[in-house]
């Protein structure tokens, strides 16, 4: 792998440590990326351990060849939202000792201009995690209604000027279609009046389009529910989020399944019955990167790690 596209795994020790790895355990790395977390898991596993990695990026599948000679490792080409299906196909439901998810876009994806994720590098306006299938960002921007664009920018990017930006895109695309990342980034920079300090005006819109094109939040919901299904008792969830939308989903999921079922007041149900409906317990508080890690890797700044454990059935 070229140095240009090298990837530093965020919160590496904390995330893998949170899995509480057993020598003979079976683990899932749902976001293989370039293999940083997988490498750490394999180093801690014994000979009878097993690691199932998942990624929908063809470049990640290619990078997984570095572990081709390790019989404990296998890679699945697909989205982590379908992890329960993959585990069921392998006959391992209820036997998984840990699931690791490193959400969002990876550094190699951001740094490769041809992938179209970054407003700082000019490239095709693509943004697909799996660039072998599905609609590109350019194709969506060419056909989307103003209302739809505004909703995406507001919902997934928390963009205050969502409607104004959507209108300007619609007005400009009739003259010149948005085919390059620079085209879109330059338009947003030009029409944004109240710019945030130390943040490019296109940041939120690019995030929103990426999340929408890849159905990222739906994938997270599906992965969390799937993990709950496949985890063994005392199995661990170790999840890194990079923005508030992701972290909110993870935080609420852990809280909901840690509190047990909510029942109307007055129903004849015992505390023991409520306890039995609890499926998870949070392990400690949310973990943030240290100042030293942020200094080494600026992209770690917004990361949040949450760890939870599957309770007995």
UniProtKB/Swiss-Prot annotation:
Query: Where does this one sit in the cell?
Result: Cytoplasm
EC number(s) per entry = 2.1.1.199
Q: What is its main location?
A: cytoplasm
Q: Which reaction(s) are listed as its catalytic activity?
A: cytidine(1402) in 16S rRNA + S-adenosyl-L-methionine = N(4)-methylcytidine(1402) in 16S rRNA + S-adenosyl-L-homocysteine + H(+)
Claim: Transferase is one of the keywords in the record: yes
Q: What processes in GO biological process is this protein linked to? A: rRNA base methylation
For this protein, the record's SUPFAM superfamilies field holds: Putative methyltransferase TM0872, insert domain, S-adenosyl-L-methionine-dependent methyltransferases
Which residues are S-adenosyl-L-methionine-binding? 35-37, 55, 80, 102, 109
Q: Which UniProt keywords apply?
A: Cytoplasm, Methyltransferase, rRNA processing, S-adenosyl-L-methionine, Transferase
Gene Ontology, cellular component aspect: cytoplasm
- Which GO terms fall under molecular function for this chain's record? rRNA (cytosine-N4-)-methyltransferase activity
Report the Pfam families cross-referenced here.
Methyltransf_5 (PF01795)
Top EC class per UniProt? transferase
Say which domain of life the source belongs to.
Bacteria
What's the stated role of this polypeptide?
Specifically methylates the N4 position of cytidine in position 1402 (C1402) of 16S rRNA.
Entry-linked NCBIfam families: 16S rRNA (cytosine(1402)-N(4))-methyltransferase RsmH
- Family recorded in the similarity comment: Belongs to the methyltransferase superfamily. RsmH family.
The cross-references to HAMAP family, in alphabetical order and at most eight, read: 16SrRNA_methyltr_H
- PANTHER family, alphabetized: 12S RRNA N4-METHYLCYTIDINE METHYLTRANSFERASE, S-ADENOSYL-METHYLTRANSFERASE MRAW
Q: What is this protein called?
A: Ribosomal RNA small subunit methyltransferase H
Q: Which organism is it from?
A: Shewanella oneidensis (strain ATCC 700550 / JCM 31522 / CIP 106686 / LMG 19005 / NCIMB 14063 / MR-1)
